[in-house]
């Protein structure tokens, strides 16, 4: 994930190791774009004449449009189940609604677009159609280190393997934890040493770490209940003998829960715990939207790192998301990062939208242009209006008009529509300060999902919505042979192992199925016998 990549960058920075021309840190999708697709796209006809990456909002809009065109009258949840992926030879994988997937990909190709999942496929095809490309890239790599390898997909392994096969001198390392393999539903695979060796033609040594420098021993003992492959974990941090606080409440109502969480946060902050050491998480986003707004109102003196429940959805591959970062952050802060983002924007304009900015116009020029236009804004206290104002002037200054570049305007409209939908549907503030808050440094209380929290650690973790149907999800309960038990075990392991000292778990009462049945607590959690604090 992007957040895990940022975490690695921060840890390198603490060691006085900044990512420069010799070190690159990022997601596999970012790697595929920067190292394979952008420089070598001419080798694959599907993207050789340019391409734009659509986001999931645009994807849903396309599928909904096709649904109407075919008069299928499928509901949203039915549309979401349609497999839009392609095989390695660009064939449709969907079985039941093949025409939907076919029309979707025809639409993408006509528009010179690819979706997020196609990034991997396109990169792999480029490496296979021209062996010189793989050799060229591999010859410039000394080492490849893969974190969270248990969540790596088959196609991701294949991309990495192509490079390793073309340079036996590359040092490679795969690090992960089988108990944290929470992306199985997204085809994540934890390959064995033997499988890796066969795939990459490299030899690996297998090693296991038994020490934990994060959680106290009591917490370790608690979340060891959720191990898939039991082995003893020893707490070795300075807090190893601390008792901490572990509670589980399955009787509180969803109406009373926000106030309880507010009081927990107040108590922890008053006891000296930093805001950045507190995390509130849920299995899915939607309970966090209203909870986040409530906490911001009730705790106005607190800062929140709640980018996942903000007006703009995080999308590090999006031109318009990157522009938003520059619009809503201060010009004199983190100049190096702002220059990198500005450079990314210029690259995307060229590679995805075919917009050739003049050679002498560099990242600093873009930053100066944005800063000057921002100072011109005198409209209402509205983040969307500010965004539109600055973007309009940027386009004019760069000679980007709708007649010559219709694609960028189409995607700009999709972006604005999604922002306005998120504000309306989740009752979010549209003030400029609300937009700025989402891009502030991660020093506040974190609100995020169980999947996004992986790789991070906090003194205090507050987990809500631990209910059957959420963990495990209904899709796993109905469609997986073990009814989602394995998935639930791993997700609970990830949630609980984020905490250093304090863990508050809630299976709140008041959620119902579409048939009106009350959702009950996640069974794996409900069955555990433990000496809770409450």
Model-found features: residue ranges?
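Helicase P-loop NTPase motor core
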Residues: 202-205, 211-299
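Conserved short internal alpha-helix adjacent to the catalytic or cofactor-binding core
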Residues: 296-297, 306-340
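Coupling/switch/interface segments within P-loop NTPase motor domains and analogous charged loops
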Residues: 45-110, 356-406
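Conserved RecA-like helicase ATPase core segment
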Residues: 42, 154-155, 159-242, 529
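Accessory C-terminal helicase-associated subdomains
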Residues: 346-453, 457, 473
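P-loop NTPase Walker
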Residues: 1-43, 497
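Accessory N-terminal region flanking or inserted into the helicase ATPase core
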Residues: 64-145, 154-159, 184, 192
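C-terminal accessory regions
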Residues: 374-377, 441, 467-534
